[in-house]
Curated annotation (Swiss-Prot):
The modification N6-(pyridoxal phosphate)lysine is found at K40. Pathway: Amino-acid biosynthesis; D-alanine biosynthesis; D-alanine from L-alanine: step 1/1. It catalyses: L-alanine = D-alanine. Substrate binds at R139, M309. GO terms for biological process: D-alanine biosynthetic process. It comes from the Bacteria. Transmembrane segments: none annotated. Catalyzes the interconversion of L-alanine and D-alanine. May also act on other amino acids. This is Alanine racemase.
Length: 374
């Protein structure tokens, strides 16, 4: 018996859907703009070493990760014409290691720029790097004063090869937020100070703001993995994941009885409770207790009681007994149970749902509608 057979849950990842989402997002860009693939956090929890080849096959040649080790883990998958950007830049003391790789660090501060310039000078080569300017997020990036100082003294920039200038939108998922236009204007002014460099502003939601936000390179992340980039409207992206939990036990309730920790739900007489082998240790949000929904044999079934570490309980009273049985699979995410819907019920965001998908889930890569267990 293999891991998938022993496991109490199954996560199916549709690589074709990821590729289709990338193609759809690229198709929305202005002529001449390129589309990267953000594969940080192990491709949002879905497996970067599986996702990267799918994006390469679709035509993607620009990739983005957050940390050096994430980049080193997938570098061997990339052809010579691909580029891999590391958003956090080189940690202090790791500059030589990054130089020895083909990673392109994003330099976020005067200190990082100085350290990268000195490392390049020691190595005797002008290695590539990207520059991050802060236009309103207030996390990483050069402030306007730091940018002025950098351009006033060209010596550090002369020691390496800048290949990209970028910033990050703070409110792109709110199209009418005034900060969007403010950031675009600030970034356009900053990018104009680096003639000849590619410029990158838009994340997934930023792509939908319009061509003025596209510049030379867009950096979609959540949209690749099925998250809705257009809040309040129909999701234009294909769903990518299907998560199923196995029923471990079915209990018939003859008199009203409480269910789960804290006795937060009382099952009425005549109800049927199914316990599934998924919990918050697997990334299913604890806050979704008494709020989330599942699907069993095409019927909607509610989570009742609290989410515990390893278990969920569902009211399956409306499902025929021959279908609500130990070994049957309840869909927790899928084409009709989106990541965004679960995030809404758990008072969180789709990014968190995806990146917390647990290591205990065996991953099956293929079509979302394969292996339904029904």
């Amino acid at each position: 018996m293999g891991h998938e057979d022993r496991a109490t849950a199954l996560l199916t990842v549709d690589l074709d859907a990821i590729a289709d989402n990338w193609l759809a997002l690229r198709g929305r860009l202005r002529p001449g703009a390129s589309c990267a693939g953000v594969v940080k956090a192990n491709a949002y929890g879905l497996g970067a070493r599986k996702v990267v080849p799918a994006l390469l096959a679709a035509g993607c040649r620009d990739f983005v990760v957050a940390q050096i080790d994430e980049g080193l883990d997938i570098l061997d998958l990339l052809p010579a014409d691909a580029r891999l950007f590391v958003l956090s830049g080189p940690p202090e003391g790791a500059e030589d290691e990054v130089l020895d790789s083909a990673l392109i660090p994003v330099l976020n501060s005067p200190d990082q720029i100085d350290r990268w310039a000195k490392a390049c000078a020691r190595a005797g080569r002008k290695a590539p790097a990207a520059l991050h300017v802060d236009t309103g997020m207030r996390r990483l990036g050069l402030t306007p004063l730091e940018l002025d100082a950098l351009l006033a003294d060209p010596r550090p920039l002369a020691a390496f090869t800048p290949v990209l200038v970028m910033t990050h939108l703070a409110c792109a998922d709110e199209p009418d937020h005034p900060l969007n236009a403010e950031q675009r204007a600030l970034f356009a002014a900053a990018a104009a100070r680096f003639p000849g460099l590619r410029a990158s502003l838009a994340n997934t939601s930023g792509i939908f703001l319009g061509p003025e936000w596209h510049f030379d390179l867009a950096r979609p992340g959540i949209g690749l993995y099925g998250g809705n980039p257009t809040v309040g409207t129909a999701n234009p992206m294909r769903q990518v994941v299907k998560l199923q939990g196995k029923i471990l036990q079915v209990r018939r309730i003859d008199t009203p009885l409480s269910v789960g920790y804290g006795a937060t739900h009382t099952a009425p007489a005549g109800s049927t409770i199914a316990t599934v082998g998924v919990g918050y240790a697997d990334g299913f949000p604890r806050s979704a207790g008494n709020r989330a929904m599942g699907l069993l044999a095409g019927r909607s079934v509610p989570v009742v009681g609290r989410v515990s570490m390893d278990l969920l309980t569902f009211d399956v009273s409306d499902v025929p007994e021959n279908l609500a049985r130990p070994g049957a699979m309840i869909d927790l995410l899928g084409p009709d149970l989106s990541v965004d819907a679960l995030a809404d019920r758990a008072d969180t965001v789709s990014y968190e749902i995806l990146t917390r998908l647990g290591a205990r889930y065996p991953r099956r890569y293929g079509g979302v509608r394969e292996g339904s267990g029904q």
